[in-house]
Amino acid sequence: MAVTQILVVFASALLLSMFFTGVDSTRSNETWHEHAVENPEEVAAMVDMSIRNSTARRRLGYFSCSTGNPIDDCWRCDRRWQSRRKHLANCAIGFGRNAIGGRDGRYYVVSDPNDDNPVNPKPGTLRHAVIQEEPLWIVFKRDMVITLKEELIMNSFKTIDGRGVNVHIANGACITIQFVTNIIIHGIHIHDCRPTGNAMVRSSPSHYGWRTMADGDGISIFGSSHIWIDHNSLSNCADGLIDAVMASTAITISNNYFTHHNEVMLLGHSDTYTRDKVMQVTIAYNHFGEGLIQRMPRCRHGYFHVVNNDYTHWEMYAIGGSASPTINSQGNRYLAPRNRFAKEVTKRDYAGQWQWRHWNWRSEGDLFLNGAFFTRSGSGLGASYARASSLAAKSSSLVGVITYNAGALNCRGGRRC
């Protein structure tokens, strides 16, 4: 593993946003900036400094087995991972690299898969765990399928860690990350999520309120920051698999396995919602697999680093956008479908060529197979992509190895994961 390609986070780095816990879903739009990274230029400067200054790096390869995947090399080769679970929080990369989840709190063991009462959840249930005000690292006592009656509304500073067991959130409502900060979701199967709502749901020990109908996303990120979604398997939900909207930022989506879905990932609320210009999202080391159609992702306004992903299936297109997002595609592998009318990786919406030719979309070091092609636009200069750069890309020839274990892992205690 090349040390110059390891993202550095300095212990003395300037805090990028203020952290708040337990913000109720009834808060007004004017509070959304509380969780935003307010200065994307500052983030870009820190990332650039991190990549160039390898002498002061954080050593993600502490237990390295040199897979080439810096996240996995950080923790997976440690046979004692089960007793050192919280080390995972030191392994994030990209724009969501400062997400610590429940690292500084106690462990909470989920022992009950039921979700009988979304207003008064029982201790031992996942819902009871995620609504608490304190930081928590949430683990599971055994294999379980959790069918949620209503959205699982998370409070700040939580980690959901499915390693060591087989946990499915399926066949009901799924996960909502709204007006909160510092969330890690790792090692969960999320599928067959359905619209729910028009019901009372608790969001903290001191608050519950009326929830209108939810779309049926696998993971919905709304007005939140410092989010890391890693090593999950997602498929077949009613709306998106992962949606991030309403000035959400400082997000990393990594090592996930996406299958059997139409509109995979939406990043940005609407063309008219300009607050999404603060959005910075890293999409790294994911496998976009069989049965996918479009939106991998579909972007608006912000800055998006798409790096070292494996795109083996799409039916319409892979990466789309509108409202002048900056898209930095580096070191990905794009395998086009057989359909000769669907070879293009990219798609621009709601703009003529005279408009989108100014949008900064670049491809650098990508591998194109079976006739795949990426339509570039805007500036080709590196400086134009500073705010859409979050880590050093590896060679696209390594993508198959880097993404080989994408999705929820089969980890067992006492063994390398």
UniProtKB/Swiss-Prot annotation:
Catalysed reactions listed for this entry: Eliminative cleavage of (1->4)-alpha-D-galacturonan to give oligosaccharides with 4-deoxy-alpha-D-galact-4-enuronosyl groups at their non-reducing ends
Signal peptide range: 1-25
EC number: 4.2.2.2
Annotated glycan sites: N29, N53
Protein name: Probable pectate lyase 20
One GO term (biological process): pectin catabolic process
Cofactor details (free text): Binds 1 Ca(2+) ion. Required for its activity.
Major enzyme class: lyase
Annotated residues for binding of Ca(2+): D215, D239, D243
Cofactors, names only: Ca(2+)
Catalytic residues (positions): R295
GO MF annotations, alphabetized: metal ion binding; pectate lyase activity
Alphabetized SUPFAM superfamilies for the sequence: Pectin lyase-like
PANTHER family: PECTATE LYASE 18-RELATED (PTHR31683), PECTATE LYASE 20-RELATED (PTHR31683:SF120)
Superkingdom in the source lineage: Eukaryota
Keywords of the record: Calcium, Glycoprotein, Lyase, Metal-binding, Signal
Organism: Arabidopsis thaliana
Glycoprotein keyword on record: yes
InterPro entries per the UniProt record, alphabetical: AmbAllergen (IPR018082), Pec_lyase (IPR002022), Pectin_lyas_fold (IPR012334), Pectin_lyase_fold/virulence (IPR011050), PEL (IPR045032)
Family of the protein in this entry: Belongs to the polysaccharide lyase 1 family.
